[in-house]
Amino acid sequence: MSIENKNTGVKKVVLAYSGGLDTSAIIPWLKETYDNCEIIAFCADVGQGEEELVGLTEKALASGASECHIVDLKEEFVKDYIYPTMATGAIYEGTYLLGTSMARPIIAKAQVEVARKVGADALCHGCTGKGNDQVRFEGCFAALAPDLKVIAPWREWTMQSREDLLAYLAERNIKTSASATKIYSRDANAFHISHEGGELEDPWNEPSKGVWTLTADPEDAPNQAEYVSLEVEHGRVTKVNGEALTPYAALMKLNAIAAPHGVGRIDITENRLVGMKSRGCYETPGGTVMFAALRAIEELVLDKTSRTWREQVGAQMAHLVYDGRWFTPLCKSLLAASESLAESVNGEVVVKLYKGHAIAVKKRSPNSLYSEAFATFGEDQVYDQKHAEGFIRLYSLASRIRALNAK
């Protein structure tokens, strides 16, 4: 397989490296295409699992990289990306909690930081030319490092399939454990795991049991419900079952508690940023419990107009995160608005976990606007029901005038 040598002056490239077939082939392709440039492999540890990192450095060096930087981003990812996004109430197209989307800006930022550290003049990613991630990564690169060249092999090389990649590596005697048959495309981090491809490409196919890897099948989940307590401060989960935990530890504990109950599974067909639709199955056990708890506290503490505003902020934030616009003035504005609203989002919630469901069944807050004295229908001294008559007349004044004018 012939490779065109571009000899463009690129001397050192930082590659977002996973150790999979694509990025294993990218390393020798870069060296051949860009005049034997130096390749620095970079891997972001965002909680995808230790098994994904074992032997990664050795694999990168064997493929031709001169260095491999594995950067631990787990705590920062949850604290500075997941928690702020969840506080806005962001949920894409009503169902997707943005697990993959939220990870892209922190990975891109860390990749740029490694590039600056090693003096690289180019960045490279292995995203396909059909997906969202190419836009997310390159949008972040544009905001953080507009001076660095971006290389996207899937938009440049002539290889079209896994068979092509395997043949390419075999020609160069580069070993890989990958095979031509890859049923699903998966992406995992501390928050979730996504599944695409294979049988899922036909929306008439029900996902088989083999699709799901993180959560139990709700049909096989325990017949006994489990209750979990979450304490929230300023829109952030700080304690689980009374235990004070860091953001990452809290998420991991909730994942471990909720996954056996089949909590957090969704099967959706979403609108990609690039215009096409795609089907994905997502597992987000701990995040689903957190989301339920935060919304329960908001029901107690946010007045009608504040909650409407929070919903608008969440809708904007969902599209912004999905579309890869984290490092923008709009993102800063939305996060600032959310922080203001979250000042009163404090309290405790008990969530019931049962066969795929996470339901907030108890909630209390020192900032609660709910008052039993005001809300009950019995006789009381704090609310005179006669006051409602004047309010209703003023509230419906425009409708009254419109009707009178129509006569």
Curated annotation (Swiss-Prot):
<dbReference type="InterPro" id="IPR014729">
    <property type="entry name" value="Rossmann-like_a/b/a_fold"/>
</dbReference>
<dbReference type="GO" id="GO:0005524">
    <property type="term" value="F:ATP binding"/>
</dbReference>
<dbReference type="Pfam" id="PF00764">
    <property type="entry name" value="Arginosuc_synth"/>
</dbReference>
<feature type="binding site">
    <location>
        <position position="101"/>
    </location>
    <ligand>
        <name>L-citrulline</name>
    </ligand>
</feature>
<feature type="binding site">
    <location>
        <position position="133"/>
    </location>
    <ligand>
        <name>L-aspartate</name>
    </ligand>
</feature>
<feature type="binding site">
    <location>
        <position position="282"/>
    </location>
    <ligand>
        <name>L-citrulline</name>
    </ligand>
</feature>
<feature type="binding site">
    <location>
        <position position="132"/>
    </location>
    <ligand>
        <name>L-aspartate</name>
    </ligand>
</feature>
<keyword id="KW-0055">Arginine biosynthesis</keyword>
<keyword id="KW-0547">Nucleotide-binding</keyword>
<feature type="binding site">
    <location>
        <position position="194"/>
    </location>
    <ligand>
        <name>L-citrulline</name>
    </ligand>
</feature>
<dbReference type="InterPro" id="IPR048268">
    <property type="entry name" value="Arginosuc_syn_C"/>
</dbReference>
<comment type="pathway">
    <text>Amino-acid biosynthesis; L-arginine biosynthesis; L-arginine from L-ornithine and carbamoyl phosphate: step 2/3.</text>
</comment>
<feature type="binding site">
    <location>
        <position position="44"/>
    </location>
    <ligand>
        <name>ATP</name>
    </ligand>
</feature>
<dbReference type="GO" id="GO:0000050">
    <property type="term" value="P:urea cycle"/>
</dbReference>
<dbReference type="InterPro" id="IPR024074">
    <property type="entry name" value="AS_cat/multimer_dom_body"/>
</dbReference>
<keyword id="KW-0067">ATP-binding</keyword>
<comment type="similarity">
    <text>Belongs to the argininosuccinate synthase family. Type 1 subfamily.</text>
</comment>
<keyword id="KW-0963">Cytoplasm</keyword>
<feature type="binding site">
    <location>
        <begin position="16"/>
        <end position="24"/>
    </location>
    <ligand>
        <name>ATP</name>
    </ligand>
</feature>
<dbReference type="GO" id="GO:0006526">
    <property type="term" value="P:L-arginine biosynthetic process"/>
</dbReference>
<protein>
    <recommendedName>
        <fullName>Argininosuccinate synthase</fullName>
        <ecNumber>6.3.4.5</ecNumber>
    </recommendedName>
</protein>
<dbReference type="Pfam" id="PF20979">
    <property type="entry name" value="Arginosuc_syn_C"/>
</dbReference>
<dbReference type="GO" id="GO:0000053">
    <property type="term" value="P:argininosuccinate metabolic process"/>
</dbReference>
<dbReference type="InterPro" id="IPR001518">
    <property type="entry name" value="Arginosuc_synth"/>
</dbReference>
<feature type="binding site">
    <location>
        <position position="96"/>
    </location>
    <ligand>
        <name>L-citrulline</name>
    </ligand>
</feature>
<dbReference type="GO" id="GO:0005737">
    <property type="term" value="C:cytoplasm"/>
</dbReference>
<feature type="binding site">
    <location>
        <position position="185"/>
    </location>
    <ligand>
        <name>L-citrulline</name>
    </ligand>
</feature>
<dbReference type="InterPro" id="IPR018223">
    <property type="entry name" value="Arginosuc_synth_CS"/>
</dbReference>
<comment type="subunit">
    <text>Homotetramer.</text>
</comment>
<feature type="binding site">
    <location>
        <position position="128"/>
    </location>
    <ligand>
        <name>L-aspartate</name>
    </ligand>
</feature>
<feature type="binding site">
    <location>
        <position position="136"/>
    </location>
    <ligand>
        <name>L-citrulline</name>
    </ligand>
</feature>
<feature type="binding site">
    <location>
        <position position="132"/>
    </location>
    <ligand>
        <name>L-citrulline</name>
    </ligand>
</feature>
<keyword id="KW-0436">Ligase</keyword>
<dbReference type="InterPro" id="IPR048267">
    <property type="entry name" value="Arginosuc_syn_N"/>
</dbReference>
<dbReference type="GO" id="GO:0004055">
    <property type="term" value="F:argininosuccinate synthase activity"/>
</dbReference>
<feature type="binding site">
    <location>
        <position position="270"/>
    </location>
    <ligand>
        <name>L-citrulline</name>
    </ligand>
</feature>
<dbReference type="InterPro" id="IPR023434">
    <property type="entry name" value="Arginosuc_synth_type_1_subfam"/>
</dbReference>
<keyword id="KW-0028">Amino-acid biosynthesis</keyword>
<feature type="binding site">
    <location>
        <position position="126"/>
    </location>
    <ligand>
        <name>ATP</name>
    </ligand>
</feature>
